[in-house]
């Protein structure tokens, strides 16, 4: 198949990944290429060139040290630049003669313009409903041309008022990149990811201390005020922050932990950290929010619906007793990126056939 992959433009699609969406776009594009498809990734210019990138936005204002774009005093500058990048692409997308457009942009323009394009589009819903996307989808629904896929059943339920019976394909990870460690060497808890209020890092530290376990925090600071105010004061000899680590080092940190602590403070649509932890054999303790209750089973973790630090502390010690083998088996059966990509290939084939059938007399 000849596939156009539309990335979002907040960050280049390259390592180190700023978040799960960048990782998803990178991995799925790479696998589609490896499977022999003719793939073009439409992304910002500093994205990984091995992904056959067609740059639609300059990264002259992107700081590779802070992994962020320089902010103009004109609050609309980023918005307008992104709007026109997608607008110009969608105006000429049919000229490329793609079989299908795989839309991961989290932007309203491709959805709006897809109603005027001949090339069929599959849009992935990576987040709960946001204003711009809702408005575009409601308008596009009149044309019945779009195919939507949600990354979890929980996320699909939130989109139900706008997209009834949305298809669901769970996100997956490359299990070959995450080594299973059957016998962990540490009794510490681990929290890893972006340090941001949405991720609730300080709750994990407080709960681990209450549980009597040391905790390691691995991740970059995505919100400096939050880090300085809520996280840094809790760091001590029993709460260590590992700011920078390679993929191999992160694998070791996860695999040797007794338990991973995952504390979403919003309705997390999926949470790749869950899959990564289970792939390494490390059970999960966390808040029962967003997609976590649909991903974490009683054999692989312990969740608290109350989101209290006291109950999370109990979950930490309970989860640490669970079978590490069961965690890896669950990752292999339900969270493998190979299964995920195959499911998307099936969707693409259906959409392409449906589009072709319209033109059969």
Predicted regions located by residue number:
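Catalytic cores of nucleotide-sugar-dependent glycosyltransferases that transfer UDP/GDP/TDP-activated
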Residues: 1-361
């Amino acid at each position: 198949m000849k596939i156009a992959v539309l990335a979002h433009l907040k960050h280049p699609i390259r390592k180190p990944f700023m978040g799960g969406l960048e990782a998803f776009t990178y991995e799925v594009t790479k696998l589609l290429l490896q499977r022999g498809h003719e793939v073009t990734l439409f992304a910002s210019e500093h994205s990984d060139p091995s992904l056959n990138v067609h740059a639609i936005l300059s990264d002259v204002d992107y700081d590779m040290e802070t992994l962020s774009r320089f902010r103009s005093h004109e609050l609309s500058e980023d918005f307008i630049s992104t709007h026109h990048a997608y607008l110009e692409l969608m105006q000429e997308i049919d000229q490329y003669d793609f079989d299908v457009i795989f839309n991961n942009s989290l932007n309203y323009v491709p959805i709006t313009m897809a109603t005027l394009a001949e090339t069929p589009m599959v849009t992935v819903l990576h987040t709960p409903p946001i204003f711009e996307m809702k408005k575009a989808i409601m308008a596009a629904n009149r044309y019945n041309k779009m195919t939507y896929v949600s990354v979890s059943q929980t996320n699909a339920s939130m989109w139900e008022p706008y997209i009834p019976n949305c298809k669901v394909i769970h996100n997956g990870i490359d299990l070959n990149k995450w080594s299973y460690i059957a016998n962990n060497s540490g009794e510490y808890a681990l929290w890893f990811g972006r340090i941001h209020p949405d991720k609730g890092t300080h709750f994990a530290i407080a709960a681990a201390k209450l549980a009597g376990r040391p905790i390691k925090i691995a991740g970059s600071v995505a919100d400096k005020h939050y880090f300085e105010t809520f996280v840094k004061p809790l760091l001590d000899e029993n709460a260590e922050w590992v700011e920078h680590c390679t993929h191999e080092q992160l694998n070791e940190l996860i695999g040797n932990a007794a338990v991973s602590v995952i504390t979403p403070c919003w309705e997390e649509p999926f949470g790749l950290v869950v899959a990564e932890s289970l792939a390494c054999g490390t059970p999960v303790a966390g808040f029962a929010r967003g997609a976590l209750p649909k991903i974490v089973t009683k054999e692989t973790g312990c969740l608290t619906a109350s989101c209290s630090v006291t109950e999370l502390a109990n979950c930490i010690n309970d989860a640490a007793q669970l079978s590490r083998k069961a965690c890896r088996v669950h990752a292999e059966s339900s969270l493998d990126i190979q299964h995920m990509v195959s499911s998307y290939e099936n969707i693409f084939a259906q959409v392409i056939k449906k589009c072709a059938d319209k033109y059969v007399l």
